[in-house]
Amino acid sequence: MIDAISFKNGTFRYLDQRFLPLQEIHVETKNHQEAIEAIKTLAVRGAPLIGASAGYTVVLGINEYTGDKAGFPEYFKNLIAEVNASRPTAVNLFFATKKMQEVYDANFENDSLEALFAKMTDMAYKIHNDEIDNCDKIARHGVELLKQDFADVLKTRKLNVLTHCNTGTLACCGIGTALGVIRLAYQEGLIERVITSESRPLLQGLRLTAWELEHDGIPFASISDSSSAILMQRGMIDFAITGADRITANGDTANKIGTYAHAISARYHGLPFYIAAPVSTIDITMAEGSEIPIEERNPDELRKIFGTQVATPTTPVVNFAFDVTPGTLIRGIITEKGAVVGNYNEGLARVVNG
């Protein structure tokens, strides 16, 4: 399996995804600020992978601490705030830092710093390993839902699926969320072909998902983001499935910009649209999608394509990194605890609290 991140002997190692698919560059660092920069610049990206990386980033930060125990609380408070500020939309990041905070709160008073740091390191490994396990469970629940929803169709043919951005090993530690469902469905003979949209402006679908599919030998075709509607119109897509960066209590889902447009097209053409994400992506403290902070990124991401200027430097740009798909457009939200279909307020609360 592709090694997107790892942590060994105090060193965080990551595959710099900005250079894929043309170059595979692995970077090693023991500096927490360098790890934060990797998250900010999308060298490391994808909500679950960001969460695991955030845990390791906190470990890097505490390993850099050289003061006494009395000075650590203020240092740790600032460290957590610094990590939290790196990607404000990805709730998995906050899930990870919350877990690290819980270890601190439970052990700081009675433990030495050495013992405390060891427990925090163990928690970072657990966050990472849990994400790997969750992907396997999400894939199984997703395939079960597809078999249920497409029982009649699957009697005569396989399915064609649309996915957006990248939700595979490069984003999720394990086999992936949405792409994990696709991988397992393909292995079980349900999938004919995967349609992956380019995912402008950083082309995660074209660069990363296509690379993973080619690596696995799964039939696919890449399309421009605006092409999904005509493929649906012509019967070339049976369903769509994406990941998520944050899901609110009512099922509203923030994901890579362009997801909402695909969901609207799917609804118009009568096709089911699914979300696959771990429970850590669900934020039931937010009632609806309008509460989700939407990151707006550097306008040069549109003005330039991998360093090549394609618009004037003064061209006004609106560059939202995410959009919010209303839960009313989503057929089901697939988690490691099962698929939630129907009443999201009840179902999502159940999987979060159960």
Swiss-Prot record:
<feature type="active site" description="Proton donor">
    <location>
        <position position="245"/>
    </location>
</feature>
<keyword id="KW-0486">Methionine biosynthesis</keyword>
<dbReference type="InterPro" id="IPR000649">
    <property type="entry name" value="IF-2B-related"/>
</dbReference>
<keyword id="KW-0413">Isomerase</keyword>
<dbReference type="GO" id="GO:0019509">
    <property type="term" value="P:L-methionine salvage from methylthioadenosine"/>
</dbReference>
<feature type="site" description="Transition state stabilizer">
    <location>
        <position position="165"/>
    </location>
</feature>
<feature type="binding site">
    <location>
        <begin position="255"/>
        <end position="256"/>
    </location>
    <ligand>
        <name>substrate</name>
    </ligand>
</feature>
<feature type="binding site">
    <location>
        <position position="204"/>
    </location>
    <ligand>
        <name>substrate</name>
    </ligand>
</feature>
<dbReference type="InterPro" id="IPR011559">
    <property type="entry name" value="Initiation_fac_2B_a/b/d"/>
</dbReference>
<feature type="binding site">
    <location>
        <begin position="45"/>
        <end position="47"/>
    </location>
    <ligand>
        <name>substrate</name>
    </ligand>
</feature>
<dbReference type="InterPro" id="IPR005251">
    <property type="entry name" value="IF-M1Pi"/>
</dbReference>
<comment type="function">
    <text>Catalyzes the interconversion of methylthioribose-1-phosphate (MTR-1-P) into methylthioribulose-1-phosphate (MTRu-1-P).</text>
</comment>
<dbReference type="InterPro" id="IPR027363">
    <property type="entry name" value="M1Pi_N"/>
</dbReference>
<protein>
    <recommendedName>
        <fullName>Methylthioribose-1-phosphate isomerase</fullName>
        <ecNumber>5.3.1.23</ecNumber>
    </recommendedName>
</protein>
<comment type="similarity">
    <text>Belongs to the eIF-2B alpha/beta/delta subunits family. MtnA subfamily.</text>
</comment>
<dbReference type="InterPro" id="IPR042529">
    <property type="entry name" value="IF_2B-like_C"/>
</dbReference>
<keyword id="KW-0028">Amino-acid biosynthesis</keyword>
<dbReference type="Pfam" id="PF01008">
    <property type="entry name" value="IF-2B"/>
</dbReference>
<feature type="binding site">
    <location>
        <position position="87"/>
    </location>
    <ligand>
        <name>substrate</name>
    </ligand>
</feature>
<dbReference type="GO" id="GO:0046523">
    <property type="term" value="F:S-methyl-5-thioribose-1-phosphate isomerase activity"/>
</dbReference>
<dbReference type="InterPro" id="IPR037171">
    <property type="entry name" value="NagB/RpiA_transferase-like"/>
</dbReference>
<comment type="pathway">
    <text>Amino-acid biosynthesis; L-methionine biosynthesis via salvage pathway; L-methionine from S-methyl-5-thio-alpha-D-ribose 1-phosphate: step 1/6.</text>
</comment>
